[in-house]
Amino acid sequence: MPDTIEPTHGPSQIQHKITLPKDATVLVVEENVSNFVLIARMLGYLGIHCEWKTSGYEVVEYADTLPRLDLILMDIRLPYEDGYGALKKIRAAERLKSIPIVAVTAEASMEQMDKARASGFDGFLGKPLDPDRFPDQIRRILSGEPVWEMS
């Protein structure tokens, strides 16, 4: 049974329901601790379990050990192996190839968004992430809707 959260946004106090899969797990691949903490707190507010890796080369091996994985949020600029290289390896892993993978990057430009799309990412979120929009972006992604937004 899905959980429902009803956040209030902005001065107009617009409310909308955010329905999320129960016990969802998101793997965040982010080398910057402050960025990870922000993302983890926003996911925690939504009741989403969060795992963390700091580099692209660790992703496939680690993700394959998780009993459940609903989404990967991955920075593009990572040490040792960037998000594009990690994406190729994830897509080659049988168990992981259908997991949605969203690029999350401070290099938010149309050029980067187009490159991410052409490389096979399922979505794009530009940094800084907007805490007011993030819950709805995650809900949409987890419900199978592609999200391609600069910030």
Short names for language-model regions:
Residues 32-36:
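Short acidic/polar segment at the start of the alpha1 helix of CheY-like receiver
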Residues 37-45:
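Charged docking surfaces used in two-component/phosphorelay signaling
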